[in-house]
Structures are given as structure tokens and as C-alpha cells.
UniProtKB/Swiss-Prot annotation:
Signal peptide: none annotated. Residues 282-306 are annotated as: Disordered. It is found in: Cytoplasm. It comes from Rhizobium rhizogenes (strain K84 / ATCC BAA-868). This is Peptide chain release factor 1. The modification N5-methylglutamine is found at residue 235. Belongs to the prokaryotic/mitochondrial release factor family. Methylated by PrmC. Methylation increases the termination efficiency of RF1.
Length: 359
């Protein structure tokens, strides 16, 4: 039996009942919205707690039946058959509840900023950067999320030397946050006459999209420069100084945006700057806890090689969890749920292990 926090579970049930009663009483619209939000957050865990309590009661009844010699032998045989199934259900519910009670990442529900930069490998790395962007774009489409490119630098033979985009939707960051790191590709370039396999790489960074309430940027801490722009992806040439470069003086972070509208560029650049500063704060807080972290998943080390895409073998390997899938074509079409779910499960398992050590 797992060491479940029974008092906390009872408190959650009590709070859930209180919210139900207050919502039924017809509160003001703004109060109702807040209550509904908390209700939807508590509902899954309270449902599991109630299922768990029913299963515990069922197991207790079956054990009492087995111990009572006055009970009909046939009934006791049935109880003996049912009890292992109920105990198995209890174990599954215990694990489900533990996961639902894990500390929540406040950024999980946010949209995300996706940054992909070509690394070693020249034009082949830029092509791979383009392939990765397309993979995430398709994954986003599969989930009903919106993708908008904020800035892009095209590779000489196609793809991207660098591309920055927003992915907007509920829970985007929770699904993509373990994608940060170095992605390596092994394949034969189209220009390679000898059929030799080349290795190149691209770096992916996924940041939670920060809002103004998340991070304060003082006017005196930034310098804004305007310059001539060739537009995102080189699609057009502006004759006005519309491109914007914002430098955050305390951190040295530089962000550029080069759409047609200077006003839009400033807003987009500030959006990326806010997210990078917010991410920097999160990284600092994470590093303070990293001495206790056992799992590589979620370490946020963007210099770490996390995944290899081997095209000749049709193989994808995630090195953090030693997961190998022979589904490269499907993954490059955006079907990355199996890897995303495995990484999330591994991270949750490491959190549970840490809680067990602290108990």
C-alpha cells in the first residue's frame, strides 16, 4: 500500500464539496468563474479519491467475508477470487492519486515560445532545423494549437538557421517542455554522391510564454534600435526602418523581430524578451533544486544531447530515458505523443521517488 496523504485527500474532498455548494447557490459571475476553475482542477483528483475509498471499502468487506466462517463456502470462494482484482485496482488508484497530487508546475498551462537553432553541420543542420520546426508545427496542428513565426533566418539550402515561434493553446508548455536540448540527425545529404552518412545537430529551446504579470521589465533596462528589414524568411524587402532590436541591458539578452509593422515588431520582440527573462528566473530556481534531482528529464540543460534521429535505420532514440522507436517517418510528421508521454511518465516517476525518500 502506498503512503498516501490521507488528511490532504480529505481536505480536497471537503473543499470540492464546498465549491459545489457555492456554485449551486448562484454567486456573482466573476466569483463563479474562479470557482469553476478550481472545480475543474479538483474534479479529476477527487473522482480518483472517491474511487479509491470505494475500492478500500470493497476490499474490507471481502476480507471480512473471508474471515467469517458462518458465510456460505461458495460466497467465500467468490470473495477469494475478487479480492486480488480489487487490491490490484487499489494499487493503480494509489499511483494515479500520487501523480495527481504531485506539485504542479505553474507554467504548465501556458502557451510556449519555440526556438530552434542550427548547430554543427552547416547547411544540413539548417535543413534539419526546418524538419524539426515542421515536426512541431504538425504536432501543434494535431492538438489544435496555433503556430506563429516571430522571426526566422533561412538556411542557404533551405530550412532555418534560426526560427522563433509562438505556439498558442492550453497546456502547450506541459507537453513540449521536455523537448529542450540538442537534437542530432544522422542521414545521407542529398548532395552527398558517395552515400556517406553525415551527422549534424540543432538546438531546441521551449520557453513558457510569459505575460506582463509574470515578469516586470523596466523602461530604463532596455535599449530599442530600429533598422532596415528584409522581412521574416526573406519574403519581402522593406524600404522603411521597421525591424526592431531590443537589448535587455542587465542580462545582455538581445531580441530582434522583422515584420512589416514596427509596432508589431516591438510587441513581438517584447513578448520573446519577457519569456526569456521568465525562463531565466525559472532556470535559476531549478538549478537551486538540481542537487536533489535524480532524473535527467526536466533538467533543462540545453547543451545536453537529448535525442538522435537516424534516417537510414528509421530510428529515433531519446537518450535520457533510453527509449528507441522505429517510427522516424511518423514522428517527423508530428506524431511525437509516444515520446512526449514517456518523458512525462519518467519525470513523474522521479518526482514520486523523491517524495518517497523524503517521507
Amino acid at each position: 500500500m502506498a503512503n498516501l496523504p490521507i488528511e490532504k485527500m480529505r481536505e480536497l474532498e471537503r473543499r470540492f464539496g464546498e465549491i459545489e455548494a457555492r456554485m449551486s447557490a448562484g454567486p456573482a459571475a466573476d466569483v463563479y468563474v474562479k470557482l469553476a476553475s478550481e472545480y475543474s482542477e479538483l474534479q479529476p483528483v477527487v473522482a480518483k479519491i472517491r474511487d479509491y475509498e470505494k475500492a478500500i471499502a470493497e476490499a474490507s468487506d471481502l476480507e471480512a467475508m473471508l474471515a467469517d466462517k458462518s458465510v456460505d463456502r461458495e460466497m467465500r470462494d467468490l470473495a477469494d477470487m475478487e479480492l486480488p482484482e480489487v487490491k490490484e485496482r487499489i494499487e493503480v488508484l494509489e499511483q494515479d492519486i500520487q501523480i495527481l497530487l504531485l506539485p504542479k508546475d505553474a507554467a504548465d498551462e501556458k502557451s510556449a515560445i519555440l526556438e530552434i537553432r542550427a548547430g554543427t553541420g552547416g547547411s544540413e543542420a539548417a535543413l534539419f532545423g526546418g524538419d524539426l520546426f515542421r515536426m512541431y508545427e504538425r504536432f501543434a496542428a494535431n492538438n489544435g494549437w496555433k503556430v506563429e513565426i516571430l522571426s526566422a533566418s533561412d538556411g542557404e539550402a533551405g530550412g532555418y538557421k534560426e526560427v522563433i515561434a509562438t505556439i498558442t493553446g492550453k497546456g502547450v508548455f506541459s507537453r513540449l517542455k521536455f523537448e529542450s536540448g540538442v537534437h542530432r540527425v544522422q542521414r545521407v545529404p542529398e548532395t552527398e554522391a558517395g552515400g556517406r552518412i553525415h551527422t549534424s545537430a540543432a538546438t531546441v529551446a521551449v520557453l513558457p510564454e510569459a505575460e506582463e504579470i509574470d515578469i516586470e521589465i523596466r523602461a530604463e533596462d532596455i535599449r530599442i534600435d530600429t533598422m532596415r528589414s528584409s522581412g521574416a524568411g526573406g519574403q519581402h524587402v522593406n524600404t522603411t526602418d521597421s525591424a526592431v532590436r531590443i537589448t535587455h541591458l542587465p542580462s545582455g539578452i538581445v531580441v530582434t523581430s522583422s515584420e512589416k509593422s514596427q509596432h508589431q515588431n516591438r510587441a513581438k520582440a517584447m513578448q520573446v524578451l519577457r519569456s526569456r527573462l521568465f525562463d531565466m528566473e525559472r532556470q535559476r530556481a531549478d538549478s537551486e533544486r538540481s542537487a536533489d534531482r535524480k532524473s535527467q528529464v526536466g533538467s533543462g540543460d540545453r547543451s545536453e544531447r537529448i535525442r538522435t534521429y537516424n534516417f537510414p535505420q528509421g530510428r529515433v532514440t531519446d537518450h535520457r530515458i533510453n527509449l528507441t522507436l522505429y517510427k522516424l517517418d511518423r514522428m517527423m510528421e508530428g506524431e511525437i505523443d509516444e515520446v512526449v508521454d514517456a518523458l512525462r511518465a519518467d519525470y513523474q516517476a522521479s518526482q514520486l521517488a523523491q517524495l518517497g525518500e523524503q517521507a
